[in-house]
Amino acid sequence: MKTSLLCGAAALCGAVAAGLLCAAAALAAPLNLPIWPDAPAGADSGEPREQDSTAGWHEHYIRNVRQASIDVYLPDAAKATGTGMIICPGGAFRFLTMEGEGERIAQWLNYRGIAGFILHYRLKPTAHSEFLFLLEMLHELPPLLDGSKIGEIGPLATPAIADGVQAVRFVRARAAQWHLAPDRIGMIGFSAGGMVTIGTSLTADAHDRPDFSAALYSGPLDVGHVPANAPPLFAAAAADDPLTAIGTRPIVAAWQAGGAPVELHIYQHGGHGFKKGTDSEHWTEDFSAWLQARHL
């Protein structure tokens, strides 16, 4: 039972292969900063603010986030480009896959001279007990992974997207402090974090949007009309991921219909989470080329 749970959970949260980002240097523990001046409307002010663990997945993940914050990863000043990216890990709005979809991504960005800011966005409450949490995931994750109950995840995105918008405001307001260009603040998200990225990219106030966006194997989000001035979007997914047809493809179609710039990569294999040893591992190369083409 435990093995089945871990396989399903790891697939849904989309842990990025450990070897993929091995070129990134290990960094010291990052500075963690709350992004709201006060608890946002609707936020649970109970303690603890979040729960940190490695149980079950045998890698770092966070759950029960009640108040949003960011981890700050700044590159070496000698290679800094002035670009920053807010990173939104996945985890079905139940947890955040901090290692594969957060820390390694930040380190890889730093290697390229880009500042990384891992967003701890608000999540659905789960059992405090690790054992009970794993039982919850055994029940809840499979129908989300196969798409049969994916509609239930949409409402959970609302507070997380609000945190995404606030994260853009927060980082942009401190651009000078972190030696960033305020018009070079991007956002990248994985799975549920892709939904946060897409929702943030379409917020009503254009000043609160990221300047460029990337969504990897995004969950489905009803985006409606996409304006022509929406941020340029890099999207990637795998053909053998059941969520690609209802997540990534409609999002890209909406970007195209609105006349906003978008680049799509569909890899033949990789499933939900870009499994190791598949052609989806090339996404970092494709994303690097996309960034370079935009002088980022």
Region annotations inferred by a language model:
Residues 8-24:
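Bacterial N-terminal signal peptides
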Residues 39, 239-242, 269-271:
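Acidic beta-to-alpha connecting loop that harbors the catalytic carboxylate
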Residues 39-49, 53-62, 66-69, 76-81, ...:
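Serine-hydrolase catalytic machinery in alpha/beta-hydrolase-like enzymes
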Residues 134, 258-296:
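C-terminal catalytic histidine-bearing segment of alpha/beta-hydrolase fold enzymes
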Residues 156-230:
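Primarily recognizes the serine-hydrolase "nucleophile elbow" in alpha/beta-hydrolase
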Residues 234-237:
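Short beta-strand/loop motif that positions the catalytic acidic residue
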Residues 242-248:
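Conserved alpha/beta-hydrolase "acid-adjacent" motif
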